[in-house]
């Protein structure tokens, strides 16, 4: 037998000459090639468009998330690839109203799209889940049932004097601090007000920010923690990166853990203080305790209260800041808003949430602000149930992580005409151009924001009272 009859004999000398290191590298290269081939041609999501690197790695996803630019990158990708984009090996992003309904809303005959493990990072002390972090639908429904009493129309009406107390002090303090040369940073002051309101309702006492004009240290810690959530998600997607990061930056990890423990301990101390002093004050805790089930522990009450503070403060302040910015940039919009408020109320004392909620232009202002600058710009990831399901006409395999990014949806020319223009009138006119349902600042379905009515009360009272009393202008003309 010669080499022509057995060509494999020609390879044997070369193969036997390979060093273990070379063999390993060749094997690794073949494995990577096979992996990439599978991700691009055989994976259940291979047919969906997106950057090639997203098919085989989470690097692109995490890079922009940690940078804080992910929402705008997703807008760019949707403009390039269409209404559905593969953003990671097992992730799809959508940007349509239909996808909002299919992913988040209740659909008869369809299984629930449960929250992804992204929410596991929100577990409180002693592994207590809250209304936000609980992923199991049955347990979440149980929580929502006993918490809903605190957010009912009757409860919110009883809570309005507590809200008004902060709002009125806010208006007074604007005169004290705003009369100084250089004006005030209204973003800071809106945060002081909304944190004070939610503190009063969640813990029975405000943080005193409006009175002092200073940010409470605990609030600074919360805002920092929100920014760290991106790093936590990256650790989940790259466990080895997490190990390396902890080894390279032990002090940074230690600081993060200390901040988390400090936040939890302070929250628990506030709850313990409130529980030790029974009160009929019509706040969240009173309503929660009135309807307290046997399985609701003190730590879990603290977890819920923590969620209320995080979800119900900075988001509202963001919307208020956005409104004021566009009011100062658009004289005609400013004139319409102030005229509506000042024509409606003869006296400052006449302004209340019921009357303010009937101000149509003010309502449109808020809707447009939440569209052009979503207060929660991050997508809320869900998992496609067993057997797969259809989303906006696309069949998606089970186990896929799916979501709608608010920025990608609200700033898409497919959903809104001239999406970068601040145009409150789009919410007052009947037109066939804008798809209003593509903007869902409070989400929808069984996991929709429990405090949306509270948010509307805060928005309407703070804006109407401030604009009834003051004329405002943007002093820093370089702000854009």
UniProtKB/Swiss-Prot annotation:
It comes from Penicillium roqueforti (strain FM164). Gene3D superfamilies: Cytochrome P450. Pathway: Sesquiterpene biosynthesis. Belongs to the cytochrome P450 family. Keywords: Glycoprotein, Heme, Iron, Membrane, Metal-binding, Monooxygenase, Oxidoreductase, Transmembrane, Transmembrane helix. Its main location: membrane. GO terms for molecular function: heme binding; iron ion binding; monooxygenase activity; oxidoreductase activity, acting on paired donors, with incorporation or reduction of molecular oxygen. Glycans are attached at residues 265, 352. This is Cytochrome P450 monooxygenase ORF11. The gene is ORF11. It comes from the Eukaryota. Its cofactor is heme. The lineage of its organism: Eukaryota, Fungi, Dikarya, Ascomycota, Pezizomycotina.
């Amino acid at each position: 037998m010669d080499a022509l009859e057995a060509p494999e004999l020609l390879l044997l000398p070369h193969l036997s000459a390979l060093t273990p290191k070379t063999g390993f590298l060749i094997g690794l290269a073949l494995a990577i090639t096979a992996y990439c081939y599978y991700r691009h041609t055989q994976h259940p999501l291979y047919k969906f468009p997106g950057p090639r690197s997203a098919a085989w790695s989470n690097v692109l996803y995490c890079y922009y998330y940690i940078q804080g630019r992910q929402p705008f990158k997703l807008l760019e990708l949707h403009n390039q690839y269409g209404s559905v984009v593969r953003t990671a090996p097992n992730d799809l992003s959508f940007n349509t109203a239909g996808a909002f309904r299919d992913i988040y809303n209740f659909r008869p005959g369809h299984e629930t799209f449960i929250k992804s493990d992204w929410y596991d990072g929100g577990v409180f002390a002693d592994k207590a889940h809250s209304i936000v972090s609980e992923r199991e639908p049955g347990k979440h429904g149980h929580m929502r049932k006993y918490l809903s009493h605190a957010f009912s129309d009757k409860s919110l009406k009883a809570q309005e004097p507590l809200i008004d107390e902060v709002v009125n002090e806010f208006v007074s303090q604007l005169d004290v601090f705003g009369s100084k040369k250089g004006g005030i940073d209204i973003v800071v002051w809106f945060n002081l007000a909304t944190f004070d309101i939610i503190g009063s309702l969640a813990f029975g006492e405000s943080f005193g920010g409006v009175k002092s004009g200073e940010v409470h240290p605990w609030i600074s810690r919360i805002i920092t923690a929100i920014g760290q959530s991106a790093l936590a998600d990256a650790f989940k997607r790259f466990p080895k990166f997490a190990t390396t990061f902890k080894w390279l930056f032990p002090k940074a990890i230690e600081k993060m853990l200390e901040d988390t423990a400090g936040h939890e301990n302070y929250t628990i101390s506030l709850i313990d203080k409130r529980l030790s002093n029974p009160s009929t004050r019509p706040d969240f805790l009173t309503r929660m305790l009135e309807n307290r089930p046997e399985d609701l522990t003190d730590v879990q009450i603290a977890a819920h209260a923590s969620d209320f503070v995080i979800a119900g403060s900075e988001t509202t302040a963001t919307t208020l800041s956005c409104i004021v910015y566009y009011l100062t940039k658009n004289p005609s919009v400013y004139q319409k808003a102030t005229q509506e408020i000042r024509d409606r109320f003869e006296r400052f004392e006449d302004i209340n949430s019921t009357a303010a909620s009937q101000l149509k232009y003010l309502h449109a202002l808020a809707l447009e602000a939440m569209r052009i600058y979503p207060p929660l710009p991050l997508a809320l990831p869900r998992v496609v149930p067993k057997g797969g399901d259809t989303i906006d006409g696309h069949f998606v395999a089970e186990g896929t992580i799916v979501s709608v990014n608010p920025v990608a949806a609200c700033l898409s020319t497919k959903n809104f005409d001239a999406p970068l223009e601040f145009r409150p009138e789009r919410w007052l006119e009947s037109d066939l151009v804008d798809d209003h349902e593509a903007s869902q600042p409070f989400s929808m379905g069984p996991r929709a924001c429990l405090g949306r009515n509270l948010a509307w009360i805060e928005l309407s009272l703070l804006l109407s009272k401030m604009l009834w009393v003051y004329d405002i202008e943007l002093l820093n003309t370089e702000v854009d």
